[in-house]
Amino acid sequence: TYTREILNYLNSTDKYEIAEMSAYGEENDPRAADIPWKFYGVMPSKNAPEEVKKHYSSVPTYQFGEFAFERVCLDFKPDVVCDIRDFWMLDFVERSPFRPLFKWCIMPTVDARPQARQWIATYQSADACLTYSDWAGGVLKNQSGGKIKYLGSSPPSAHPAYHPIEDKVSLKSDFKIDPTVKIIGTVMRNQRRKLYPDLFCAFRKFLDKVENKHDYMLYCHTSYPDLGWNIPELLQEYNLSSYVLFTYICRETKKPFASLFKGAIMQSPFTGRYGATLA
């Protein structure tokens, strides 16, 4: 989503010739027909020769773009290559024989410290480095001894669309939430590495200590079912069924709404029909 917004903005300026290399797009992908910039799909097409498909599957990092990167460089001849993703998805760019011919701007995910030394070394080789937070920038500067060419943080929340709404009372009322309730929120996918059990345990301890536990709610913008935790089981384990809100989306109207957990699918308040899914 973040990369898409950046591409749309850059394209709107009419200042740049833009190309997108899509890791999970196919060569000659029909979904790219309406994209207003040059598009390169990394995956072999469905009718590609079997030896090409086997070659693509032979190296794990090929799926992140390494499979097509040299071909794209030869065809597009980029002046700047931008990578907004994790280390293991971008490190092949450092090894490219065409690396001296373009500037490399990266925005790696830095959400823990210390970072691996190999990661820091790769980040140092980039011509420019951005982060999602000032804290992450501090981690990179400290570990590299100031050698990383750090430009600053550029989070998606810098966009005006994410500007905090000052009238929180009206906002809560619009979502049918008690405006007097204080909300603690989190946005993270339901994966095993995301510590939902610890979060629910900590929130339960918090509720047990405050004077009026009904003054607080936890809001989770997450997914279920997914590859991670059994959300309803955790809610029962920590007796939080009445204290945790989730984002559901009505598939017919595309409108989001907040609700206590009602399963993976619940009735939409907009249509009265079942089909609203946990975001």
Q: Which role does the model predict for each range below?
A:
Residues 177-194, 200-203, 218-219:
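Conserved donor-binding/catalytic core segment of Leloir-type glycosyltransferases
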Residues 107, 132, 154-157, 186-190, ...:
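Short hydrophobic "strand-cap" motifs at the C-terminus of beta-strands
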Residues 34-128, 134-135:
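Extended catalytic core of nucleotide-activated donor transferases of GT-like folds
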Residues 1-9, 198-202, 227:
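Conserved alpha-helical elements of sugar-nucleotide-dependent glycosyltransferases
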Residues 97-99, 222, 228-277:
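Nucleotide-activated donor-binding/catalytic signature segment of Leloir-type glycosyltransferases, i.e.
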Residues 162-177:
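A short helix/loop element that forms part of the nucleotide-sugar donor recognition site in Leloir-type
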Residues 1-27, 76:
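N-terminal subdomain of nucleotide-sugar transferases
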Residues 25, 135, 150-166, 251:
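Short beta-strand->alpha-helix junction loop in the catalytic core
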